[in-house]
A protein has these predicted regions:
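C-terminal segments that line or cap access tunnels to active or ligand-binding sites in enzymes
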Residues: 226, 235-369
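Glycine-rich FAD pyrophosphate-binding loop
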Residues: 18-47
């Protein structure tokens, strides 16, 4: 008998498996329909010995000390600050838009104060910010919106920015300085030996059993368990009772080239007529040294594995119906991007999983106290319980993982 069946071995499922096993002493079975752990963050060494991300670039960044220290139990880190260029008008320009972007695009020599005035002069103020188009046009005007955002967003989401919630483009800042970092989070780093090795360390516990190439529907009636943690698509769980929730998918084209460097930045965006949205060169991300280099093209599409919930009002309304079903389903916990139909970053999923663990473990401990009290022992009614949850004030030393380079 397992205490928990966890569906999905990505961040949400793996964090909860580790916490329940190591933190609460529970027996956990975690399954995944794919042939590997790690979810979309899975990485591996290709035939040339280069570490690549199978499902596109995954850049770790967070402002949460708790999340960073928790993951540091399972990996050492390679310091990395992400940078992106956009191919616009035949030039490779920094994105998010900053002072250098404007000066190079228009052949100007503005200062930080002057570029702020420039943005104000081209901005088209919107009385209400409802859509992704509103966000950008209100901030930097129509021309920059057309050059950097419109086509990229249409390719990525299959919809015009005027049809998408403001949240999509609100994630991308506009800067008046020369800061070319894509993120400004306190903690920016990549797992030194890759994400997969980190997940292996996370799931390396005697209370955890992993089953791959396994659909949970095939085992839930034959393997006994007490509760389920589900990280897959919520509409699938309920057999599409209210219809299928739309997700965007991706197709990846991986290539290896016989030269050390392919492009001048880790990622180059193509907000124009190319079918792909961006090209990523992995050695920038991993810090690996190799005579060859590997890249990946990303082609957004409507069908395929679900990657991104589509942020539109009508979709949120359908999800609300599924959430009501989820809340009313006993002994099943819905966690992660697909199960809660939200566009989470990796650190946000880890934080959600840690919070879920605290709630589960706290509730179980409180139930145990009540049972003890009912038997004449333990705390008396009305006695306050200490705060329950996980503290990670110390970074535990990761196990030695060997040499990162397999070239």
């Amino acid at each position: 008998m397992f205490d928990y069946l966890i569906v999905g071995a990505g961040f949400a499922g793996s964090v909860l498996a580790e916490r329940l096993a190591a933190g609460a002493g529970k027996k956990v079975l975690i399954c995944d329909k794919r042939p590997h752990i790690g979810g979309n963050a899975y990485d591996h060494y290709n035939d040339s010995g280069i570490l690549v991300h199978k499902y596109g670039p995954h850049i770790f960044h967070t402002n949460s000390r708790e999340v960073f220290e928790y993951l540091s139990r399972f990996t050492e880190w390679h310091s990395y600050q992400h940078r992106v260029l956009a191919c616009v008008d035949g030039q490779l320009l920094p994105i998010p838009i900053n002072l250098d972007t404007i000066n190079k695009l228009y052949g100007l020599n503005l200062t930080s104060f002057q570029v702020e005035d420039f943005f104000q002069s081209v901005a088209e103020p919107r009385a209400q910010i409802r859509t992704s188009e509103d966000v950008v046009v209100n901030r930097v005007g129509r021309e920059l919106y057309e050059k950097f955002f419109r086509n990229y967003t249409r390719k990525q989401w299959g919809l015009d920015p005027s049809e998408l919630d403001a949240s999509v483009t609100a994630r991308v800042p506009t800067r008046t300085n020369r800061d070319q970092r894509y993120f400004t989070d306190t903690y920016q780093a990549m797992p030194l030996h890759g994400y997969t090795r980190m997940f292996e360390n996370m799931l390396d516990h005697p209370n955890i059993k992993v089953m791959l190439n396994t659909d949970y529907n095939e085992i839930e009636r034959v393997i006994p368990f007490r509760e389920m943690i589900y990280t897959g698509p919520v509409d699938t769980f309920f057999d599409y009772r209210y219809g299928k929730l739309p997700y965007r998918s991706l197709e990846f084209k991986h290539e290896t080239h016989g030269r050390e460097v392919f492009q001048p930045a880790p990622v180059v965006n193509y907000p124009n007529e190319q079918l792909y949205t961006r090209i990523t060169e992995f050695k920038y991300l991993t810090g690996q040294e190799h005579a060859k280099t590997s890249i990946v093209y990303e082609f957004p599409q409507a069908e395929g594995d679900p990657y991104y919930p589509v942020p539109r009002k009508e979709n949120a309304e359908v999800y609300a119906k599924y959430k009501a079903l989820a809340d009313a389903t006993p002994d099943v916990h819905f966690v992660g991007r697909l199960a809660t139909y939200k566009y989470y970053n990796m650190d946000q999923i880890v934080a959600q999983a840690l919070t879920t663990y605290s709630k589960i473990h706290g509730a179980r401990r409180q139930e145990a106290v009540i049972k003890i009290g009912a038997n004449g022992g333990g705390l008396r009614a009305g006695t306050s319980l200490p705060a329950l949850g996980m503290t990670t004030t110390t970074i535990a030393t990761a196990r030695p993982l060997g040499d990162v380079s397999r070239s």
